[in-house]
Structures are given as structure tokens and as C-alpha cells.
């Protein structure tokens, strides 16, 4: 099961566990919450770890400073993504994360304002299509498209176009196919043979680059 709302779902999940039903938490929620509820394991993308891996990848590409465009700052997972990226780079998050809001025009304006005030920014990290799409428009308008390092969480039509065009270096795919597939495999083997992986399973981050777009497009809406 997913754990989109801990307050709403924790009771029923705990009741199922108490009745001897084996539970695996997938997609939403956290490994800590899964353990607290007595679930066998968690299969998903830990947000901090995904941000950390993205930051380490960017550091390897020469990035030392960045702008994190946070369009849902009230959610702790969003800040974890930005903090992980900063830690991966080995820098302080500080004021490199902005609360962009969710209005596309406002996001575009705030990104352009930040980059105008901080022209030496090496990279941009967006947290999904909501912030990525307006940010694409911003860097196209200010002439930074293709020059500033650009990575994003999640995939979408405009993000895929940006990767194709070379404006976006990569999109992070949490690989929901694995989130649905692996729990079935784990539970089947657990009930048949009594074997269980010793740790949670991270389904992401999977980094989608221009080289990997063919399969993403082929299976979009089906496996991807």
C-alpha cells in the first residue's frame, strides 16, 4: 500500500499488521514510517537520498552553486530534495532554495529575478513539471538555455523536450513500475520460501538522460 497521508492511513495499516497481514509500503511515505507501522519494508524513492545522488552527479559535472526552485515548500520532502542536492555538492543550502509558489508566471519571474541577481549560478534544480516547465521558459528568455546546468525531479512532456534539446541534463525518475512490481515479487518469495531482503528497496533515483529517452517515450504511460 501507499502511505500518502500518514494520519489517515496509519491506523488501518497498523490494524492490518496486528491481524497478521504482511504489509509493504510503496511509493509514498518513508522508510521510517514503514518501520514504525510494522511493515515488512519500504519500496520507493527516499527524497533526501535522491537529492544527494543528484548533487553528487552534478558535482562530478563541475557544479558548485545552484538554485533549487521549490514549488511546494510546505512539504518536508521538497526541502529534503534541495538539502540533499546541496549536501551532494558539499555546499550550504542557505538562500539557494526559493519558494517559487505554483503559479507558472510567478515561477518564471522569480527564477529570472534570482538568476539576474546571482548571474554566476552554476545550476538549476527543479522539483517536478510544475516548476520545471516555467523555469525552461525563464532560461530560454534570459539566454541561459543550454549554458546553465539544469536537472529536475520527475518527467513530463516539456521536460522530455528539454532533455532532447540539451537544455536539461537529466530528469529523475522514481520508477513507479518498480514500486508496484517489486513488492509483489518480495511478498511472493516471502510466502513461498520465507526469504526477505534485509533492507528497504530504493526504486529511484533513476536518471533519464538524452541517451535513455527512447525507452521512456516508447513505454510512457505503460511502464514509465
Per-segment meaning from a language model:
Residues 1-18, 85, 100-162:
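Hydrophobic alpha-helical
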Residues 3, 40-41, 65-73:
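Short beta-strand segments enriched in small/hydrophobic residues
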Residues 11-49, 156-164, 168-169, 217:
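Flexible loop/hinge segments that line or gate small-molecule binding clefts
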Residues 18-23, 37-39, 61-65, 90-94, ...:
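Loop/turn elements at helix/coil->beta-strand transitions in domains of secreted/extracellular proteins
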Residues 41-66, 105-108, 155-159, 175-192:
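Hydrophobic alpha-helical segments within soluble ligand-binding/sensing domains
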Residues 50-54, 76-94, 110, 134-138, ...:
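Short, solvent-exposed amphipathic alpha-helices that sit
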Residues 65-68, 85-105:
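Short beta-strand elements in bilobed, periplasmic/extracellular small-molecule ligand-binding domains
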Residues 88-89, 178-224:
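Hinge/cleft segment of the Venus flytrap/periplasmic-binding protein
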Amino acid at each position: 500500500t501507499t502511505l500518502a497521508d500518514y494520519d489517515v492511513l496509519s491506523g488501518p495499516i497498523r490494524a492490518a499488521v496486528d491481524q497478521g497481514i504482511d504489509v509493504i509500503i510503496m511509493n509514498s511515505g518513508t522508510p521510517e514510517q514503514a518501520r514504525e507501522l510494522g511493515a515488512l519494508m519500504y519500496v520507493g524513492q527516499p527524497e533526501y537520498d535522491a537529492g544527494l545522488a543528484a548533487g553528487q552527479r552534478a558535482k562530478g559535472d563541475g557544479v558548485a552553486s545552484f538554485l533549487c526552485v521549490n514549488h511546494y515548500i510546505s512539504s518536508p520532502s521538497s526541502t529534503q530534495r534541495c538539502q540533499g542536492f546541496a549536501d551532494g555538492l558539499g555546499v550550504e543550502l542557505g538562500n539557494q532554495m526559493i519558494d517559487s509558489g505554483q503559479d507558472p508566471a510567478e515561477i518564471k519571474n522569480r527564477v529570472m529575478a534570482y538568476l539576474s541577481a546571482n548571474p554566476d549560478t552554476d545550476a538549476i534544480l527543479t522539483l517536478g513539471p510544475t516548476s520545471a516547465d516555467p523555469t525552461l521558459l525563464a532560461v530560454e528568455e534570459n539566454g541561459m538555455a543550454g549554458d546553465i546546468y539544469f536537472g529536475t525531479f520527475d518527467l513530463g512532456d516539456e521536460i522530455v523536450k528539454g532533455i532532447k534539446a540539451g537544455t536539461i541534463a537529466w530528469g529523475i525518475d522514481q520508477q513507479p513500475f518498480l514500486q508496484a512490481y517489486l513488492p509483489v515479487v518480495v511478498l511472493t518469495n516471502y510466502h513461498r520460501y520465507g526469504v526477505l531482503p534485509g533492507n528497504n528497496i530504493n526504486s529511484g533515483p533513476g536518471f533519464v538522460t538524452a541517451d535513455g529517452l527512447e525507452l521512456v517515450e516508447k513505454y510512457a504511460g505503460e511502464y514509465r
